[in-house]
Swiss-Prot record:
GO annotations of cellular component type: plasma membrane
Cofactor: Mg(2+)
Transmembrane stretches, start-end: 32-52, 79-99, 102-122, 140-160, 176-196, 207-227, 247-267, 271-291, 296-316, 345-365
Primary enzyme class: transferase
Stored HAMAP family: MraY
Record key words, sorted: Cell cycle, Cell division, Cell inner membrane, Cell membrane, Cell shape, Cell wall biogenesis/degradation, Magnesium, Membrane, Metal-binding, Peptidoglycan synthesis, Transferase, Transmembrane, Transmembrane helix
Membrane topology category: Multi-pass membrane protein
Name the record gives this protein: Phospho-N-acetylmuramoyl-pentapeptide-transferase
GO terms for MF: metal ion binding; phospho-N-acetylmuramoyl-pentapeptide-transferase activity; UDP-N-acetylmuramoyl-L-alanyl-D-glutamyl-meso-2,6-diaminopimelyl-D-alanyl-D-alanine:undecaprenyl-phosphate transferase activity
Location(s) in or outside the cell: Cell inner membrane
Purpose: Catalyzes the initial step of the lipid cycle reactions in the biosynthesis of the cell wall peptidoglycan: transfers peptidoglycan precursor phospho-MurNAc-pentapeptide from UDP-MurNAc-pentapeptide onto the lipid carrier undecaprenyl phosphate, yielding undecaprenyl-pyrophosphoryl-MurNAc-pentapeptide, known as lipid I.
One GO BP annotation of this record: peptidoglycan biosynthetic process
Gene: mraY
Length: 368
């Protein structure tokens, strides 16, 4: 919305005197900062009202796993879920205000985010109303996620330039590109769905998921800005993708809304993100990675999410094949709880790991 002030200053005679001042809205960096501040303020202001309403409507709050750590049955009982609504509301408001409304990449990523958010919301709704940890049928949920992801990947392919639109870029090497053809649809959908569910699995302790999400969003905001700038892309020898720089504004909005949410989600949490938030934010990260052609780098920057997802896969596979469990409990953050680590220890140490992985992922921009 604010982006249109530039055009108004050119077309409305009375606003021409403000043109030098309004010119700042041309800059993605300025609008990214504005989106970040707006997202944070929105969640700070409306967060208490949203939490009170969710607590009133949900009654007993999110059901706690009976087979999980016993401390959770006491410390987390009665805490409302669906806190992702706070983040998504801040994200949408900030994006509408600060992003270029004519940029198709913005709307594709936003569509994936809200689509996954709706799936997560329905999953949370079933869990709360039925007071069971089992929500949406797994296959149905996965099918809906795949449909959204496939539609987004198809739109991204149509936006890109051939044959690069279906290419997989290999980091660390200059100009090493593998054209996947239409198989890129399946690959891109796998990245988006995988990211959504990996973040979902990570969201098991107070503050554990939101900070790594913010770190990843900040990292991909930088990558999107650089990939969407012809000068920087040429200097760093990364592929230039016109228009993707605008995705930095979305990342700024997530960073701000995430900071606001963390205020209420810090231990002991007043609200949980729920599948509403974790699925949506993971899907957003996956779709941005596909849009800017840094899918492999997402596995590095989001390595913590990968670790959480792999721990579940390994645990399930091992138990089905051998009848034995590799970890005391999965996802892996619960394994460390069973080893005696306190919740703050696990959360802060995982944050540190996320920072280190983000730095490693960003370093690939220069290692060519």
């Amino acid at each position: 919305m604010f982006y249109w002030l530039i055009d108004l200053s050119n077309t409305v005679p009375g606003l021409s005197i403000f043109k030098p001042m309004l010119n700042v809205f041309r800059y993605i960096t300025f609008r990214t900062g504005g989106a970040m501040v707006t997202g944070a303020l929105f969640v700070f202001l409306f967060g208490p009202w949203i939490i009170d309403n969710l607590r009133l409507r949900q009654g007993k709050g999110q059901p706690i796993r009976a087979d999980g750590p016993q401390s959770h049955l006491v410390s987390k009982k009665g805490t409302p879920t669906m806190g992702g609504l706070m983040i998504l509301s801040g994200l949408v408001v900030s994006t509408v205000l600060w992003a270029n409304p004519l940029n198709p990449y913005v709307w594709i990523v936003l569509a994936v985010t809200l689509g996954f958010g709706f799936i997560g919301f329905y999953d949370d709704y079933l869990k709360v109303t039925k007071q069971t940890h089992a929500g949406f049928a797994g296959r149905t949920r996965l099918l809906l996620e795949l449909l959204i992801a496939l539609a987004a990947c198809y739109a991204l392919i149509r936006l890109g330039r051939e044959p690069f639109s279906t290419a997989l870029v290999i980091p660390f090497f200059k100009d090493v590109v593998v054209d996947l053809g239409w198989f890129f649809l399946a690959f891109g959908a796998f990245i988006i769905v995988g990211a959504g569910n990996a973040v979902n699995l990570t969201d098991g302790l107070d503050g554990l998921a939101i900070v790594p999400v913010m770190i990843a969003a900040a990292s991909f905001g930088m990558i999107a800005y650089l990939a969407g700038n012809a000068v920087f892309a040429d200097y760093l020898q990364i592929n230039y993708i016109a228009g993707t720089g605008e995705l930095a504004v979305l990342c700024g909005a997530v960073l701000g809304a995430g900071l606001g949410f963390l205020w209420f989600n810090a231990p002991p949490a007043s609200i949980f993100m729920g599948d509403t938030g974790s699925l949506a934010l993971g899907g957003m990260l996956g779709s941005i990675a596909v849009a800017v052609k840094h899918e492999i780098v997402l596995a590095v920057i989001g390595g913590l999410f990968v670790l959480e997802a792999v721990s579940v896969i390994v645990q399930v596979a091992s138990f089905k094949l051998t009848g034995k469990r590799i970890f005391k409990m999965a996802p892996i953050h619960h394994h460390f709880e069973q080893l005696g680590w306190t919740e703050p220890q696990i959360v802060i140490r995982f944050w540190i790991i996320s920072v280190m992985l983000a730095l490693a992922g960003l370093s690939t921009l220069k290692l060519r």
